[in-house]
Amino acid sequence: MLTVIELLIGVVVIVGVARYIIKGYSATGVLFVGGLVLLIISALMGHKVLPASETSTGYTATDIVEYIKILLMSRDGDLGMMIMMLCGFAAYMTHIGANDMVVKLASKPLQYINSPYLLMIAAYFVACLMSLAVSSATGLGVLLMATLFPVMVNVGISRGAAAAICASPAAIILSPTSGDVVLAAKAAEMPLIDFAFKTTLPISIAAIIGMAIAHFFWQRYLDKKENISHEMLDVAEITTTAPAFYALLPFTPIIGVLIFDGKWGPQLHIITILVICMLLAAVLEFVRGFNTQNVFSGLEVAYRGMADAFAGVVMLLVAAGVFAQGLSTIGFIQSLISIATSFGSASIILMLVLVILTMLAAMTTGSGNAPFYAFVEMIPKLAHSSGINPAYLSIPMLQASNLGRTISPVSGVVVAVAGMAKISPFEVVKRTSVPVIVGLLIVIIATEIMVPGASSAVTGG
């Protein structure tokens, strides 16, 4: 009975939050209120408000405020600062004319490609490869927004389509060494090499190709439906005094991430890399004119870009975190797990139920990790009791959690991308929805073809 009540409370609050955001209310305010309501109800029901890793203040009422403080410190101190630095860097690149120079140089070879959608797909594949270097979905999305997004928009790709491309790469796990893959391999009771390279990687590549094709047709359909015209920026209209080599500057963070990964050079945090990139740009600006005042004034533009990112993106991430914690403490995720365990032992039915529940949990909480980590614990037990191959359950669940995050209006990557693109999170979700559904279907079909469903097929083979 309690499971039904917890699910009902979660669904009612989710519907209420969605309704007010769609009506145009501040997403930050609505998510804060929704999260606080859930946390208060959780406290009244006797649930612990703070995560297990945090120490209680001794009073439930102050624990709620304490969690907001924890989020403010963690979001602002690490992820938030990274977002602010990237937004400040992007603003500085525009100010010094580096972004204009990228468009000016790129437009010459790109003019031979008539369709902006082909350029968009090329950008998507590049972004997917970047996911091998940047494991954080939000971090990758923000990095792409600061580098690829301005280029895509300026060569004729609509803002919505470009934002969807930046939000999509982490929807499918490509890296064979990510924490999620390691955990899934353990649950699947397979060696990591076999699980990651022989099974998961081919399924991931198939899903990425399918999503790329879906992006091409879906973004084109939405642009036509919304009467969005694609006009390549006239190169003659671009007036910049920046030298041609400045076109490399917007991409220095990507180059830095690839170089300073611990293999080619020292392993540096992306914020450290961004500081180096901004210092490099500032030094070049000084060498160009030997005008210290102009250099310092230009850096002020970067600082204002950081401030705008705090107000528009970081606080929205904090609010989304409060909402996700509210759903977790109310018992919403645990209720979904209880539903999954109540289904029969037919392999395809159990797999589909787990995939749907994992995806729903990811969509409502905005987290790709939390639902998968919650569900993956029960895979070995479920698999053995039902005579099912654990890998048959873990692979689609692994991908479903990340796909669900990509169509969650409260996920960090969607919120950050929408904030930087200055569009609604629901617009990003609409743009990513069909590619995500296509990706999920391919994952399910490929798993059915490539992974034996019965555990006897594994042990007997």
Task: Describe the residue ranges of each PLM region.
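Membrane-interface alpha-helices at helix entry/exit sites of multi-pass transporters
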Residues: 104, 113-122, 152-166, 193-199, ...
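Core transmembrane alpha-helical segments of multi-pass membrane transporters/permeases
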Residues: 32, 52-100, 271, 275-334
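Long, contiguous bundles of hydrophobic transmembrane helices that form the permeation core
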Residues: 2-14, 18, 31-38, 42, ...
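Membrane-interfacial loop-to-helix junctions in multi-pass transporters
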Residues: 3-7, 73-80, 108-122, 155-161, ...
